[in-house]
């Protein structure tokens, strides 16, 4: 998986998308009129080796206080249960921040990924068509699982 940050500074089309009025309207309806861009990223997941993103809260990385940020995830390709759509734990944003540990995969620590243990029986998949978006609070527990898809996806 490849993560590219600060896309709005590198690409005019991406910048125009991030500052598109309908997205700003969604953000202001949720957090009020003082909207600021805190962080952006694009995730590129090559087929079959795209990698998983373990359960985490975005604020586990950001550590902002107060934790009053949202993420708007825009699907650049169709994302469903066969190719790494987002999974969330509904209502988890109402809980206190979780302690995150470094993610592990095949007995290796992944220093750039955080992870938290959750009750997966309550998780919900959020499939998105290309061009659609989902919004979640920075304390919402979410993940993307690794799949054996044969198509390269650029979901976020």
Locate each region found by the language model:
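A short hydrophobic beta-strand segment most commonly corresponding to one strand
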Residues: 72-74, 136, 151-156
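Double-stranded beta-helix
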Residues: 79-143
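Non-heme Fe(II)-dependent double-stranded beta-helix
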Residues: 1-55, 61-63, 101
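Short beta-strand His + acidic residue motifs that chelate non-heme Fe in jelly-roll/DSBH
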Residues: 72, 142-149
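Acidic, His- and aromatic-enriched active-site or binding-groove loops in soluble protein domains
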Residues: 57-73
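Short, structured patches in soluble enzyme cores that scaffold and shape functional sites
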Residues: 41, 57, 74-78, 90
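Extracellular structured ligand-interaction cores
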Residues: 67-71, 83, 123-125, 155
């Amino acid at each position: 998986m490849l993560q590219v940050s600060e896309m709005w500074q590198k690409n005019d089309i991406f910048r125009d998308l991030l500052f598109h009025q309908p997205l700003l309207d969604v953000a202001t309806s949720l957090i009020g009129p003082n909207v600021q861009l805190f962080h952006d990223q694009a995730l590129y997941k090559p087929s079959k080796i795209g990698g998983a993103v373990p359960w985490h809260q975005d604020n586990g990385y950001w550590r902002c206080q107060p934790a009053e940020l949202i993420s708007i995830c825009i699907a650049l390709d169709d994302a469903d249960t066969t190719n790494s759509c987002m999974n969330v734990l509904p209502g988890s944003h109402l809980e206190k921040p979780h302690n995150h540990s470094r993610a592990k995969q095949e007995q290796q620590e992944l220093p750039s990924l955080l992870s938290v243990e959750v009750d997966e029986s309550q998780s919900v998949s959020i499939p998105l068509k290309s061009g659609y978006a989902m919004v979640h609070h920075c304390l919402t527990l979410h993940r993307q699982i690794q799949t054996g898809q044969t198509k390269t996806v650029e979901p976020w």
